Amino acid sequence: MSSLASQLAQIAANSRSTLNTKVLKAAHSKSLIFEPRVAATQTYPEIYSICLEGFEELCNLDSRFTKFTQSLWSPQSQEADRTQMSAAENAALDKHVEAFLHLCGSRLRLMPTIKAIEWLIRRFRVHEFNTAALIATFLPYHTIPAFVTLLSILPANIPKEYRFLDPYIRSLTAPPRAAIVQQATNRPELLTAISQYTLDSCKYQMEYPGLISFWGGVMVEATNGLLDKYRSGRRSIQIENDNALMQQLGPVLSDAMVMKSSPGLQIASYMVVTILAAKGGLADNALTAFMDQLVHGWTPETMRPGLVTLCIISQHRSAKQLSARVTKALLKVPEVASVMNEIGKDHRVDKLANGLALALVDRLHKKGDVRSLPVVNSLLLGNVLREKQIKVVYKSLLVAAHRINDQVDQDGAIRKELGTVLVSLSQAGGEVGDIVRATIDEVDFDIDALELTLGASIRPKLAVEDAPEAAAEDNNTPKVDKEAQVAQNFEKLSKLKPQTASCFAEEPLDLLEELYSLFLSVAANESNLQKFDEAPVLSRPQAPTKLFYASFYMRLWCGSLPTLAKVAALDRVKNLLKDEEFATLDFQAVVPYAIVALSDPAKKVRRAAAELVTVLGSFYETKPSKARRVWGSEGLYAKNAAVNWLDFDATKSLIHSVLIPSLEESILHEDHILAALTNALESSKSKDGDKKHLSHSTRFAIFKFLSSHVVGTPLIAVKLRLLQSLNQIKSISGTSRTDLLLSLLQWWARLSEAEAQQLLAREAVDEASVNNAFVDVVIANNEAGLRLIFELIRDSNVITRNGLVQSLFSRVQKIWSSMKAETQFSTARALLTLSQAVHPTSSEPDVIATEATDVLHKVELTTDILLDFLESLYDDIKKATEKPATKRRRVGSSEKSVDSQSPADVSASLSKATFVLELVQESEPAKHPELLPSLFTTLSELQHLRTVVGSELGYLQSLVLSSLLAMMPAYKDSKELTIDPAAGHGDILASCIQRSSSPTVINAALLLVASLARTAPDVVLHSVMPIFTFMGSSVLKQADDYSAHVVNQTVKEVIPPLIETFRKSRRNLVASTAELLTSFVVAYEHIPSHRKQDLFITLIENLGPEDFLFAVLAMFVDKYGATDNMLAFTTQIIGSFSVEIQLQTLIKHLDLISDIFKPKPVLSAALLAKVDSNSEQDVVKLATKQLTLLPKLLVNRRLRHEISGLAEKDDMESVKIRELYAQLLEGVLTLAGTVKPKKDTLYTRCAEALSNLLNLLSIAEFIKSVEALLDRPNVILRQKVLRALERRVDSESINNPKSREALLAFLPQLTAVIRESDDMNYKHTAVNCVDKIAEKYGKKDLDAVAAAAATIAGDSCLGQPSQELRVMALLCLASLVDVLQDAIVPVLPIAIPKALGCLEESIKAEKPDGALHNAAYAFMAALAQHIPYMISGAYLDRLLVCSNASAAAGLNEECRDSRTDCLQFVAKLIEGKVLFTALEKNWANAASSGYLALEEYLHVLGTALDKHPKSSIAKNTTLFTGIFLNAFDLRRSGVLSSTQELEKIELLINETSLKMIYKLNDAAFRPMFSHLMEWSTTGLPKSDLAGKAQRQVSTYGFLQHFFENLKSIVTSYASYIIDSAVKILSAPLTSDDVLKTLRSRVLRTLTKCFEHDQDGFWQAPAHFNAVAPVLVAQFGHAAGADNCTNDLVLAVVELAAAADSKEHHKEINSALLKHLRSEQAAVRLAVIKCEQELTARLGEEWLQSLPEMLPFISELQDDDDEVVERENRRWIVGIEETLGESLDNMLQ
């Protein structure tokens, strides 16, 4: 049974359907928009109509929402109930809901979206049925308020992955991002849920940037956290953790990286993968899988970030080749190598590039993919690989070259391409080339054989092609094997005819090419090579006489063939020379070619060449007796080639002294042999000693020998290699290399472009190197060579060879510096002519002119050359601007006259002018100052040329001006250089500036003016003003930095001499420059904002800030008004100058303002706007602007900062600044006095300026600064200074020790002023200063303050008749009491009487003086507060009397407050006995002074009673007795005529008396109480009944208050009043009001006694019987006019309650009932009311006597008086209510 119950409970808990109406209502109230109470009342149609609006808006925003119109948003959806749907229907609905939520995700911040989701929540309860999807949709927006609202409506059980939200659901706060990241790190299910939601959104193309950013951020941080979490020190555990991590993240990242429709998701996944790779320490297989997946999914949009990710992954992967998939993908990237190079600027790409290169090389040799070679080449050359990687890749290329076979590369194309790449890499420059060459040296397989293989891969096939038809053979023909092919080659070789002629004389190119190919095919095999060597065509047996054999091999090793082939060729010749039959020959013809071989790039070639040279050396060890025949002396070269052969000695020297000693180094370094040869030919002295030097003749012979071979050999490579050495030799024995080699240049230049290119291509040499080497044969100052150069330049055939032309001009440029001056001059003229040559037939730019121009730009031109150019330029410009002569104009029959040169001539002139002026500018004009006159002339002529051309010619003018400007320093530094002032240069510049519209020209001209003003001011000063006027409207407006520089320079250089000129003229300096200042000020609004401040600071600095700063600031404010911007700007300006300058400026500014108010202003009229001096309104307006500026200038930061440092200095500078400060202060004070009558605004500005001025200096420095002012005879000024000091003291910090010391030190001076001055106002100000100083700092120097107090209290101050002075003195003394306290005691015997006298005087005066009155009280209050013992005896009596008089005088509220404040201090602080004695004495005076005096008296007494201790009160009971007896006798004394005032005073007396009673014990107070009762009854004569009654009224008023407040504790004191009360009540009634009041107070007093009796006091028969009969008897008087019926009834009721016994009740009741038979209705009525109250109060207790009452009640029912009868009925009702039964039966 229990199991079934638990199952049912579980089902109920998980069920979403219920019949509980409260639960249903609560579920219906869940809403994103509405409050629960509102939502609970809404119907589904209402909700649908509201939410449908949001859905429709979403449909307008995104048409994808419309597909939900027929499902979630159909009208029928209003009736949907998920609890009634089947599982299949709910599943289908879930799909719609989740799709809709995905689509809403991007617009959750929009209200229409919230409305739409509201419908899903209200109708479909998605927060319960689709909780996970709803939370996932909102989670990226976890910071917005809507998310918190969502949390508030979620069900109690949310999906497990989102349980971390529970605390936030409870607190209804948004979860921070850090919490989500932490949970994603520690809860895999949360990270999976977020990832799956994101992937689904991307899959449906419903993602948005916010979602991707959220997922990416969480994923990255969670991945980082997981990596930290899974990190372990044990390898096995780490592997397990890595596997677990990959299982968790791998599938998500894999899906994300291939989501091509979502680039953002892909990039975000790349970030995560990057974290994993960088921090995860993953295995290579995992990283490779990531790389494969990445490239599988990337798109053009994500390719670049993907590449970056690949780079990062690769850096954490082993250095091995990439997978096939990654390699293929990278090959598809356009320009992948350049892209990697670019990425490499920010990331390391070397491992990725290395892996790619290795993979591509692998594809190359396995699949023959030749497309990869350019990529590998680019990667190797692209600076993306490191040294080791470059070596590995290059080695892999070499290995691939070995491995490639005919199966992969059938036609040899791949090997050809690979060979080209390998060779190009080996010849590359820079670091990569060095690494590759080092790699070649390091490899352990035969590079030469490889090279030969690669080179032979094509050529053998070419060799066997018998005829063109062979190419057309069927492709299916079986391939001939290599051996058969070699045999065919040899068969072909055997059929060739023998050759004898030198290969250098005749060039059978076809034969040579064929022989080369055959040689290459056999070079690797020695036997085949031997067969080749023995071929008839080579004619080896005739080698001693025939030249073909040796020249063939010599030509071969000088060509661009593989290394192995070159070595084989060298070996053939070496072996040849070893034969004895050659011993009689002179083989010096081989030497030049051996030198070429020794400089070959390949070390093996150089080694073979060295062996050859060694063999050659053996021929020249001993001189033969007979001259040997020189091999090749006939027919080695062409017939017209003459070779200068060496004799034996020269040959021996060349070989044994130059070549053989250099062989070892030559083998190591390819350049060594040429350098050794150059060194040997350059000098006869050798570094090694005299024994090895070459003689002059030998060097000359070798020089000619080698030169002749260079000219004779047909091989360009040989010429080029030998020229590397020969071009280093200028001349030997007067014969220059130009003389020997010029024919070489002539030959090369005669070749057409096609012929030259054919030669270059055949030998694979660089054209530029050849051109440069051939042109370099021309040396400087060789007329023939230079003449040939210019002839060639002008040759129409040479013009087509651009490279040669460039080399010719480059040679001219190279040898320029070595030319003589005359040669340079002539060459420069020729170049200028060429540069200006025009070829109208050429459509392209003239190469000759361009090159000539380039040379002239690059060479250093002398002054003479430049002068010549300028003169030629001047002539051309002059011709262009002059009109033709009259005769020429009249030629022809036409009437039309030619007024100018043709446009072509003008254009040529302009072109030449431009070029020449550019040359001048580039030639560092400062080095050619002699050009200045010519340049000014040119500038002048350009002004005329402008008119002819109709153009600005800005560029030309700028060139001239910049050149002139560059010369200025030279003129300034050299006294020998002068500028003629009469030449009119200044006018030329002024004209140039005014007529030009080019900012560049204007700027340059202004800079030149500035420089001239500094260098030769007389040249330009007379032209300055027009220039500045023009500047204001043009240059100042420019925003560029250069214009700013120009203006600054102009200002710096021109203005100082201009100002100096004005000074010499003895005119008003500032007024004289008003026009200049105005031009700058007016231009202010046009000047770019960033330049304004610097410009005007520069202007002011050069004008002289001490004279002009104030003027500029004033003009600014005058022109533009005192706006915030202008005030800020002027403040910045003044803040840029020193303190001294600023203070001088402010003083002058004050003078300027003062000048405004003069009847005939002078300075202000010159600088400021013109106003009518008679119009006060205009003058005030003008002055207001300036006075608004003044305070702002005083608060600039620099002024405040620097002036604050004065205290640390005491030098002349600080003294000067203090003087200026004092002068400025005086000026401000004086100006304030001037403007005060004018207008309040002006005075306010002055006050503000004064405040800012006072705050500038520290108080110590301020005092130092104003000391001189205080010595002035002008008392008004002195007073103003002290007032300024007073204001300054207010602002000082109390904690500033320096301020304290300074002010206290100043006190004696103030005291002297008070003592000695006759001016009351001055004294007043001094006292005020003392007051403020003492208040802040007085406690630190009591002696000084005490001295000041004595002076103030004396006759010179407080004793003066001046009311204001006395007030100030009293207030000051009050402050000093606080400061000095006991130290002021010696002063008080003088001060107190004077103060009290002032107080009495202030009250007695016809018109009371409130200020004096309050000041006196302030002083007395200070005394009472701080030294109360000094107020005693007569002083206190006098003070109290004065206070009474003050109260009676009816002064204002302020006076009353000051008086009461003082009396409060008196009451609290003066010793008790003294105070109470004085109060007792003062009662009569207070009483006679009226109500207010009495009230204050009683307040003082009450306060004293509160503040003094019980002991003090107890000791003075006698005094208190006297005081209170006097008080209780107040009514009798009759001093108060107003009953209301009397009652208030009596109430106050009673309250005050209680304060005393509270502090007394019973023993002390009971005698006082007894004495009081005795005094009230017997204290007056018996005859004074009225007085006695009045005294008793007061007494019983007190007694009532006494018993009412003290209650039961004083009940026993009632025994003292019983007799008196009975006597008063028993007295016969009279009509006296006093007695009526007395009877009433007696009854009330007894009532309070009865009411608070808790001890049975009134139960005692003695007490009860004494009072009860008398009280009841009072009912008999109820009919009288003075009855106190109400008081009587209350008294009787309280007595009955207090008596609390049947006997007493019966006695009272019996007595009362007797009065019911009274004849008087009033008596009966009073008794009935009493009975009513007793019945109500005592209830059944009282009704115990009901039987006795019934007869009387019955009788009263028929009473004659209706009121009595009615009250009787009420009494009956009261009884019935008490008893709970009717009295009718009893009354019957």
From Swiss-Prot:
It comes from the Eukaryota. It holds the Pfam family U3snoRNP10. Residues 884-905 are annotated as: Disordered. GO terms for biological process: maturation of SSU-rRNA from tricistronic rRNA transcript (SSU-rRNA, 5.8S rRNA, LSU-rRNA); positive regulation of transcription by RNA polymerase I. One of its GO terms (cellular component) is t-UTP complex. HEAT repeats lie at residues 585-622, 926-962, 1049-1086, 1257-1294, 1301-1339, 1703-1740, 1744-1781. InterPro entries: ARM-type_fold (IPR016024), BP28_C_dom (IPR012954), HEAT_Utp10/HEAT1 (IPR056473), U3snoRNP10_N (IPR022125), UTP10 (IPR040191). It is found in: Nucleus, Nucleolus. GO terms for molecular function: snoRNA binding. Keywords: Nucleus, Repeat, Ribonucleoprotein, Ribosome biogenesis, rRNA processing. Involved in nucleolar processing of pre-18S ribosomal RNA. Involved in ribosome biosynthesis. Belongs to the HEATR1/UTP10 family. Component of the ribosomal small subunit (SSU) processome. PANTHER family: BAP28, HEAT REPEAT-CONTAINING PROTEIN 1. This is U3 small nucleolar RNA-associated protein 10.
